[in-house]
């Protein structure tokens, strides 16, 4: 099963980060179950991401709609954006690695989504509203780290990264499934308690992520 890991942590190689640990545990499970397959990994803070600015994506999209010629730099940026979209669509399992920063996804996570949430590609507009186009058994597993507890209790309404990604991928793109595994309470709980719960949840989610049902 083609699987793409999208890591949105600015410090993606930090071995002490719970986000990194989550990703490494997922990779261990993947290698156990699919020894003959290779993961694709995209580190958002180690690649070029075209941004929605007047000079880049807004200009490119406007010219493409009007059939106008792109500048040399716009051609490069447009190809990068297209390659990101094609890479995304070619993987039916997406693992989105995301720390919670100020109750939200990181800036580059949003920029990445701007390059793949494209009308006519991953969703379309109709008279009755938008309709998702990612209907061929696409699934997303979100690996989230957070300093407090957001899966339940008084802070659960503020788990905006989960709400946002679920809306984009499941509600608007029509992914078949969206699941979250958390390393939460990292600032208030014993480290081993966090890791034990995380590992248990990850194993359960992994089985469902690759189930044939």
UniProtKB/Swiss-Prot annotation:
GO molecular function list: electron transfer activity; FMN binding; oxidoreductase activity, acting on NAD(P)H as acceptor; oxidoreductase activity, acting on NAD(P)H, quinone or similar compound as acceptor
SUPFAM superfamilies: Flavoproteins (SSF52218)
Details of cofactor binding: Binds 1 FMN per subunit.
Keyword Membrane: no
Catalyzed chemical reaction(s): 2 a quinone + NADH + H(+) = 2 a 1,4-benzosemiquinone + NAD(+); N,N-dimethyl-1,4-phenylenediamine + anthranilate + 2 NAD(+) = 2-(4-dimethylaminophenyl)diazenylbenzoate + 2 NADH + 2 H(+)
Record's keyword annotation contains Metal-binding: no
Keywords associated with the record: Flavoprotein, FMN, NAD, Oxidoreductase
The protein's required cofactors: FMN
Domain of life the protein comes from: Bacteria
Entry EC number(s): 1.6.5.-, 1.7.1.17
Gene3D superfamilies the record matches: 3.40.50.360
UniProt enzyme class: oxidoreductase
Matches recorded under InterPro entries: Flavodoxin_fold, Flavoprotein-like_sf, FMN-dep_NADH:Q_OxRdtase_AzoR1, NADH:quinone_OxRdtase_FMN_depd
Function: Quinone reductase that provides resistance to thiol-specific stress caused by electrophilic quinones. Also exhibits azoreductase activity. Catalyzes the reductive cleavage of the azo bond in aromatic azo compounds to the corresponding amines.
Description of how the protein assembles with itself and partners: Homodimer.
UniProt xrefs under PANTHER family: FMN-DEPENDENT NADH-AZOREDUCTASE 1, FMN-DEPENDENT NADH:QUINONE OXIDOREDUCTASE
Protein name: FMN-dependent NADH:quinone oxidoreductase
Organism: Streptococcus agalactiae serotype V (strain ATCC BAA-611 / 2603 V/R)
